[in-house]
């Protein structure tokens, strides 16, 4: 069984990683809570921490039970500029400080139910996409950091950055806290959206002060680990050291382009056929470990059973299974209790490792054609606004989409 939390002081994130321990992250909150009816797809903002704290708390608990060592505050897209972007108007009823404080309180409550740490997280901003200055963007991060310091989170994460320039600004802001900082980018092997290679991104993040670097979101485990490998090689070439972190999608994305799954036509409401199985995630966990990654978790699409798969695969190295494994036989071994003999015959590793999974959709293609438009910071269509998107703006986008698909 895992170590139990309590009055005894917990080891910090760097203490764990420096000792060679495996740290298991959590999964994807905005996608999971959108499916449950607590987050709106589009803005993907986390006001549910105030409006539906019980839903956020329960998801944290499920990840903790599945084996997570880190409770990330539900503060993805909780910056002031995002909470009032494109007609969202969250700030008219709830302040950004309330959202961030509530998220910290919930994460701490659940973390203290086990041996988990609390990580306060910031992510990319509408201000950066709209070409605001470094000072203005850092001010947005600082507003969240002030809450994280007040609530005394254990460490900080700058996650989900498409541009290393903004990620560096985030790290430089967070590092002033004196707390350990992790930084992950949502990039693939081609690098960030300004063309900066993964290895150089890693070097810049470490030089800015990050102790843990890697990737999260946008790409599947296979592609994400290719990117982490390039980051690792970049650090080795520069003779820099940092711990490696991976929190990919739980969706298969072999057909995506530089911007990842956001460019796939199935994003966000048709991704279910792409969901990774628990066995896919066990394979990912082993490959990540063999690469030298010691902070292993997930992002969008990752449910608690995916996190449990990581914990189960790495149980020999960690020395224990998570509580959720009490209801899960290794490699389907619990199926030996099934009433049907052909299902009992599936109670073995070889069956699940070698199964070629059908989608049940006979007339559907196995791959899609990404429809990303190649836009990035500074492009007119990426300039953000407080006001809701107008009918005319939508009409222009619909017409452009028709033209692009021809």
From Swiss-Prot:
GO molecular function terms listed in the Swiss-Prot or TrEMBL record: betaine-homocysteine S-methyltransferase activity; zinc ion binding
Is Transferase there in the keyword field? yes
EC main class here is: transferase
Q: What is the effect of changing residue 220 to A?
A: Has no significant effect on catalytic activity
> What residue stretches are annotated with the Hcy-binding domain?
11-314
Q: Phosphoserine occurs at which residues? A: 330
Question: What are the annotated GO cellular component locations?
Answer: cytosol; extracellular exosome; nucleus
Compartment annotation: Cytoplasm, Cytosol; Nucleus
A Pfam family the protein falls into: S-methyl_trans
Q: Which cofactor does it need?
A: Zn(2+)
Q: In which pathway does it act?
A: Amine and polyamine degradation; betaine degradation; sarcosine from betaine: step 1/2; Amino-acid biosynthesis; L-methionine biosynthesis via de novo pathway; L-methionine from L-homocysteine (BhmT route): step 1/1
What's the Enzyme Commission number for this chain?
2.1.1.5
Q: How the cofactor binds, per note?
A: Binds 1 zinc ion per subunit.
Q: Name one GO biological process term.
A: amino-acid betaine catabolic process
Q: Which residues bind Zn(2+)?
A: 217, 299-300
Tissues expressing the protein: Found exclusively in liver and kidney.
Residues modified to N6-succinyllysine = 40, 93, 232, 241, 340, 377
Q: Which keywords describe this protein according to UniProt?
A: Cytoplasm, Metal-binding, Methyltransferase, Nucleus, Phosphoprotein, Transferase, Zinc
Provide the function of this protein: Involved in the regulation of homocysteine metabolism. Converts betaine and homocysteine to dimethylglycine and methionine, respectively. This reaction is also required for the irreversible oxidation of choline.
The subunit structure is:
Homotetramer.
What protein does this entry describe?
A: Betaine--homocysteine S-methyltransferase 1
Origin organism is: Homo sapiens
Name of the coding gene: BHMT
